[in-house]
Swiss-Prot record:
It is found in: Plastid, Chloroplast. Keywords: Chloroplast, Plastid, Ribonucleoprotein, Ribosomal protein, RNA-binding, rRNA-binding. PANTHER family: 50S/60S RIBOSOMAL PROTEIN L14/L23, LARGE RIBOSOMAL SUBUNIT PROTEIN UL14M. The lineage of its organism: Eukaryota, Rhodophyta, Bangiophyceae, Bangiales, Bangiaceae. GO terms for cellular component: chloroplast; cytosolic large ribosomal subunit. GO terms for molecular function: large ribosomal subunit rRNA binding; structural constituent of ribosome. One of its GO terms (biological process) is translation. It comes from Pyropia yezoensis. This is Large ribosomal subunit protein uL14c. InterPro entries: Ribosomal_uL14, Ribosomal_uL14_bac-type, Ribosomal_uL14_CS, Ribosomal_uL14_sf. NCBIfam families: rplN_bact. It holds the Pfam family Ribosomal_L14. The keyword rRNA-binding applies. Part of the 50S ribosomal subunit. Binds to 23S rRNA.
Amino acid sequence: MIQTQSYLNVADNSGARKIMCIRVLGTSNPSYASIGDVIIGVVKDASPNMPVKRSDVVRAVVVRTRKALRRTDGMSIRFGDNAAVIINQDNNPRGTRVFGPIARELRDKNFSKIVSLAPEVV
């Protein structure tokens, strides 16, 4: 469950390391974002000499949350951190690699490019 002022790790190689959520987009509850929701965030920590710089405002999709996600078959899934992947206006990732496991729900929400880059889909 991600809300405004929440910090997230960045799970790609776009150059950002941490982002802070400043707005939740396109969800039934605009206060909280879950896995697969698009957020607007500001880069708080970034690697040098990369395309994404510190204090850039970026769009990102949430790929992991510490809050347990309940699936329709009764199984719940929970990750060890809150993480997001930075995307462009066409919902394609800005980086070329994705790190760590990714939830299967992203495939249902038309983020198949991110799912194909992920090393593990849970």
